[in-house]
Amino acid sequence: LLLGRLSLHQADGAILLATELHAQWLEPYAQRHPIVQSSEFDPDVDIVHVSVDSYQAARDVMNHLLSLGHKRIALISSENRYYSTAMRLKGYLDALADAGLPATPEYIRKATVDYTFKSGFNSARSLLSQEARPTALFCISDMLALGAIAGAQEMGFRVPEDVTVVGFDDVEHTTMFHPYVTTVAQPCFDIGRRAMELLYELMNGRETPRQVVLPHSLMVRESSAARHCGFMDFPVCV
């Protein structure tokens, strides 16, 4: 383990970028050494972390889709064990419940743990092959969204005229090709900088907040549009 370098005094502290749930094994390290969780974190371990509010971000995406008139909204999630993934799923489900819409198991797909383009592509094709197909796809990462757009287009669907696609992260690729992707922007640079600031404070024996939540932004672009009845909508134009 790289964390073993702390015990060997080969490092003075650590920033963790991919902490999964059930990470209690980290606590003994954090009790002896300065450690900060950055972006991904386990809320059940007492280790400083900095992130965005993935639950609220998912609610913001869903509110956007609902405001556009979408009712058949699918989620392309992941098989990983990140807290952010769980919170985006919860935000999706809670938004449906608050809108009086059913949570349809057939509208939820779990892509690979590493958010690959191909898994987004395959998930979108699976979702859009249903007779009562969804009219909007909420993808928990931009790479999944880019794959979903490619999958939809290969099937003959137009984005956003026939199906809306929304991502998460705001990576550079979302504005390289049309349609530009509607997505949640995470302040990745600020997250990294704040994590380093927190680590520096811990390394110097100073008190720090246990959690820091930085603001996100919903970037509304070309891949999302109002629900309307088009030539490919016959089974689900309700």
Question: Where are the language model's segments positioned?
Answer:
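Intrinsically disordered, low-complexity polar regions and short flexible loop motifs
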Residues: A14
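Structural motif corresponding to alpha-helix initiation and N-cap regions
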Residues: T19-A23
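Bacterial carbohydrate/catabolite-sensing allosteric modules
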Residues: L1-Q10, Q24-W25, A30-Q37, F41-V238
